[in-house]
Structure formats: structure tokens, C-alpha cells
Amino acid sequence: MNKYWTLVLLLSILVVLALTFYFFTPLLDGIVMGVVFAYVAKPVKRKIEHVGRIKASVIATAIVILPISVLMFYGLIQGLNQAIYLITHYKVIESGILNILSKMGIEEGEEYVKWITSNVFSILQSSIQPSAVEITKKATLLILNFFISIVVCFYALADMENFVRRTTSVVPEDRRDEFRRFVEEIDVTFESLWFGNFVVAILIGLVSLPFFLYFNVPFAPLLSGLMFLAALIPIFAEWMIILPVSLYLLLVDVGRGLSFLLIGVVFLYVLPELILRPYFVGYTSKIHPLVLMLAFIGGGLVGGISGFFIAPMIVGLATAIYNYYTKEELATENHDPESV
């Protein structure tokens, strides 16, 4: 009879967990981002913890979230304005393309270019109108997830230690120290992973500013901030800044556009994403650079925004488990009298 009720209890817990996951799935991006932001803000909270747990959590959350929110919303507004301008003023792009062709010595095909641009922009205008509701839904969900990430970040900073303490009290007493050390290993790995990733994003944003200024790109400080924001999501996101800027410079001056594209790809993408980030973050979190790079790429392809963060965390969890048990084995060998 006891076994029957134990089975019913386990099944009930599984059903509740499955339903919870199902209802939380649309908000998964916000929850995961909130956890990541909490690990980024954790070193800040540790420095100011003397002011109190709640106050330190609020300040640390604000220090991390405020710059990101300002850059994200201002970037979205500017991007929307520029997209509307391009769609309604496609003649400017058309004349820019014709200017590029004339500089390259290609005089033929003017009517063909005009026909292509007019058709492309008419298709864009007609396709945007029916999908306006869908775009509004996605934008609303994005904003909602971002605000959820702020709330999750704050509560993760404020209450995570209490949660771990209560969870530890459920563990059998003879295993509590082992469980506590295991949780600490995971915590250190995740903190090193996401704080290191945040530092690399800041470096990419700072390094991009001289490039934008050198090539006389408008809104250079804003674009540098957006590069930092894009670099928070590794491997893919920088292209959302590099390609539009390259296209703009190509319309202004072909040589400048090609030079920026080449230099931008090498110094703002290949070097930081394929060399600096994997090695730096791998060094701080003790995760192998190749495994980390594959986790970022695979997670993004499979799970979108949340996948970018969940896959490296799974790899980080596996690394923490490996590091913990290798440390335990080494400690056991050192204390073994027969090994002396």
C-alpha cells in the first residue's frame, strides 16, 4: 500500500512539473535571461552586500539591467524608424545602387535595377501589412520576457542563497556537506561563464567604437552600444550590426563599405567570437573552448534566444560535475594512508 501511494505521489509531482513547464514555456526566454543576468550581477552584489541583501540585489540588478534596457529599447526604436524610412524612400537606395554601378563602370541595366527595387519594396510593403498583428505579438512577448528577466534577476540574487539553504536541509545529514560543495562548484562555474561572457561583450562594444568613428558611421556611440548588446548573444548577433552598416557604407562609398566589411568581419567577429570568447570564457569557467563554442552555436540553432543560454549552462553543469568528482577523488587519494 505504501509503495502504491509513493508511486501516486511521484506521478503527481511529475504531472505538476510538466504542467508548470508547459505554462512557463512562452516565458522561458525571460526566465533564462534573468538567471544569466543574476550571475552577471552576482559579483557586483557581493561587493556591496554590506548595505543589506535586498538593497544590494536592487542595486546590482539596476547596474546590469539599466544599460541593457536603454540600449535595447532605443535601438529598437531607431531600427524601426530606419526600416520605415527605407521602405517609404526606396528611391534613395535605388539611386545609391545605380551610383555604385556607374562607379564600377557598368552603365547598362538601369531599367532592370529600377524594376527589381520597385518590385522588392512593393513585396515588402504588401507582406508587412498582413503580418503587423504577428509582429506586434512577438514584440509584446519580447518586451514581456525582458521585464520578466528583470524580476527573475532580482529574486535570484535576493533569495537564491535561502533556496539553496532550504534545499540542503532536505538532503540527508551525512550528505549535506557533499551536496553544499557540489552546489558551490556549479555556482562558481555558472558565475565564471556568464560574467566572462559579459566582459567579452563589453570589450567587443568598446573595440567597435573606433571602427565606427574611423569610417564616419552615423550614431557611432549608439552602434557601439548595440554591438555590446549583440555580443551578449554570441556567434550570430554581431551580423545584425555589421551587415547593415556595411550596406550603408557601400551605398555611400564602395571602397569604404568593402573595407569596413572586411575589417569588421576579422576584428569584430572572427577574432573575438572564434578565438577570444571561447578561450577567455573557457579559462574562467574551466570549460573547453571548443565545447563552449559548439554549445553556443548548437543552442542558438535549436532553441533560439533561450538556447544560446541553456546549452552553455548544460555544458557548464557537466563541467562542474566533472570538476567536483575529480577534486573529491584527488582529496580521497591524498588522505588515503596506503597512498603515502
From Swiss-Prot:
Transmembrane segments: 7-27, 57-77, 140-160, 193-213, 225-245, 260-280, 290-310
An annotated GO cellular component: plasma membrane
Domain of life: Archaea
InterPro entries: AI-2E-like (IPR002549)
Entry's localization field: Cell membrane
Keyword Transmembrane: yes
Keywords: Cell membrane, Membrane, Transmembrane, Transmembrane helix, Transport
Membrane topology: Multi-pass membrane protein
Pfam families according to UniProt: AI-2E_transport
PANTHER family reported for this sequence: TRANSMEMBRANE PROTEIN, TRANSMEMBRANE PROTEIN 245
Similarity comment text for this entry: Belongs to the autoinducer-2 exporter (AI-2E) (TC 2.A.86) family.
Name the record gives this protein: Putative transport protein AF_1800
Lineage, highest ranks first: Archaea, Methanobacteriati, Methanobacteriota, Archaeoglobi, Archaeoglobales
